[in-house]
A protein has these predicted regions:
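Active-site C-terminal subdomain of aminotransferase-like
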Residues: 1-68, 72-106
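PLP-dependent enzyme catalytic core of the Aspartate aminotransferase-like
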Residues: 20, 100-155
Length: 155
């Protein structure tokens, strides 16, 4: 049973939920579209993209496409380096907050399935997109990908 203060926090948060979700989803769509054309990204996984294999189904079931975006980059080394080079994106294993989070699932949330047939790809980066400026988030992720690509090529 939640206490009175916890209940008050939930009630207060509900007042801004719609605007936060709108921004969360819009930012994810902008980021997914941007990185779909990025030379260091092999594939973007986001159901809001028309190129996603589940786009039609998602569009028939959802008003919006959420704030989770996954990137398959060129190598495991690049993915590990990139998640450690962001300044705005926080390296964390959570989702659903207002802040943007980045993780390397193969070493973090899905490490226990590393040898399974359904294991997370080692070159996968997972993003939980927050409500910060989409331009700032893109710029931060851009610099991390460029620096990580340079490091993986030279190292």
């Amino acid at each position: 049973v939640p206490g009175p203060f916890d209940a008050w926090l939930v009630l207060r948060g509900l007042k801004t939920l719609a605007i936060r979700m709108e921004r969360h989803c819009r930012n994810a769509a902008v980021i997914a579209a941007h990185f779909e054309r990025h030379p260091n990204v092999a594939q973007v996984l986001y159901p809001g993209l028309p190129t996603h294999p589940g786009h039609k189904l998602a569009a028939s079931q959802m008003r919006d496409f959420g704030g989770m975006v996954s990137l398959l980059v060129r190598s495991e080394e690049q993915s590990i380096a990139a998640v450690g080079r962001t300044k705005i994106w926080k390296l964390a294993e959570s989702l659903g907050g207002v802040e943007s989070l980045i993780e390397h699932p193969a070493r973090m949330t899905h490490a226990s399935t590393a040898d399974a047939p359904f294991a997370a790809p080692k070159n996968l980066i997972r993003l939980s997109v927050g409500i910060e400026s989409a331009d700032d988030l893109i710029e931060d992720l851009e610099q991390a990908l460029v620096r990580s690509h340079s490091a993986s090529v030279s190292g």
